[in-house]
């Protein structure tokens, strides 16, 4: 556990982690302070951050399970202590840490007698099981248990739909909420018109994110929500400027990215995510599938590397360069 003394800043707005601990593999706790804030600002930020922490962060979980010769969800299987429903509920609790986008497959294939735990899940390399000791089922006889799983990244809580699954697959209520709980409190200090506030923010996570990672992710998501308002004003200004400006010749892709890298020197490129650059949905999804999430990831690839991405075209490469040149005001 890490604790630090709280020193209140009287000038520049600063945030700090004052307590951090891991109570178990699936329970992390962090306490943060932000100060100094003007009267009323702490509550504004605290409410927004709590909602973003609980509702805007994506998590990874099992959303479907399939096993042969299972007549219905509430049936039992000879040689297995738990019913099918109980196994599904145990699978629902498995916590994953991943950066995958979309849906991936996983599986369990074991032979009894033995206990089945999360360690027995065969998952893609991009998916890590947070607690491999999580219990799934108990095989009491020498039988085979094979389950196909569907793993998905999403956010919030999604209730399974009551459809008819004749292929032997069963949906699982998706709980894609890495943050278990979040609270904020406010401490006021000073007198009269000089009154200021300190915001205390407490975060509990399930281990798929640390509290600090969750705080950063929630902050980024909040920023993304407000970007359209900023871009609307920028677009109006650009339209006026472009009426009297000649179109400049395009850089080559290599020179353009080199120039961008120089302009961004001194800024943490790994903190600039590509979803902040207003890329077209298809281009954005192609980059995400290739594990290109930040500007640093993008600048680490050459034009040839990008052209190797499935469904990627030379027009996409030119479009990316144009958007980044505009974003970072390259002359």
From Swiss-Prot:
Gene Ontology molecular function terms on file: DNA binding; DNA-directed RNA polymerase activity; protein dimerization activity
UniProt-listed SMART domains: RPOLD
Catalyzed reactions: RNA(n) + a ribonucleoside 5'-triphosphate = RNA(n+1) + diphosphate
Region (Alpha C-terminal domain (alpha-CTD)): 268-331
SUPFAM superfamilies: C-terminal domain of RNA polymerase alpha subunit, Insert subdomain of RNA polymerase alpha subunit, RBP11-like subunits of RNA polymerase
Assigned keywords, A-Z: Chloroplast, DNA-directed RNA polymerase, Nucleotidyltransferase, Plastid, Transcription, Transferase
EC main group: transferase
One GO cellular component term noted in the UniProt record for this chain: chloroplast
Top-rank taxon, per record: Eukaryota
EC numbers, comma separated: 2.7.7.6
InterPro entries on file: DNA-dir_RNA_pol_insert, DNA-dir_RNA_pol_RpoA/D/Rpb3, DNA-dir_RpoA, RBP11-like, RNAP_asu_C, RNApol_insert_sf
The keyword Protein transport is assigned to this record: no
Gene3D superfamilies per record: 5' to 3' exonuclease, C-terminal subdomain (1.10.150.20), DNA-directed RNA polymerase, insert domain (2.170.120.12), RNA polymerase, RBP11-like subunit (3.30.1360.10)
GO biological process, one term: DNA-templated transcription
Pfam families: RNA_pol_A_bac, RNA_pol_A_CTD, RNA_pol_L
Region described as Alpha N-terminal domain (alpha-NTD): 1-233
NCBIfam families per the UniProt record, alphabetical: rpoA
Role summary: DNA-dependent RNA polymerase catalyzes the transcription of DNA into RNA using the four ribonucleoside triphosphates as substrates.
Subunit annotation: In plastids the minimal PEP RNA polymerase catalytic core is composed of four subunits: alpha, beta, beta', and beta''. When a (nuclear-encoded) sigma factor is associated with the core the holoenzyme is formed, which can initiate transcription.
HAMAP family the record matches: RNApol_bact_RpoA
Domain comment (free text): The N-terminal domain is essential for RNAP assembly and basal transcription, whereas the C-terminal domain is involved in interaction with transcriptional regulators and with upstream promoter elements.
The family this protein is said to belong to: Belongs to the RNA polymerase alpha chain family.
Protein name from the UniProt record: DNA-directed RNA polymerase subunit alpha
Organism, scientific name: Illicium oligandrum
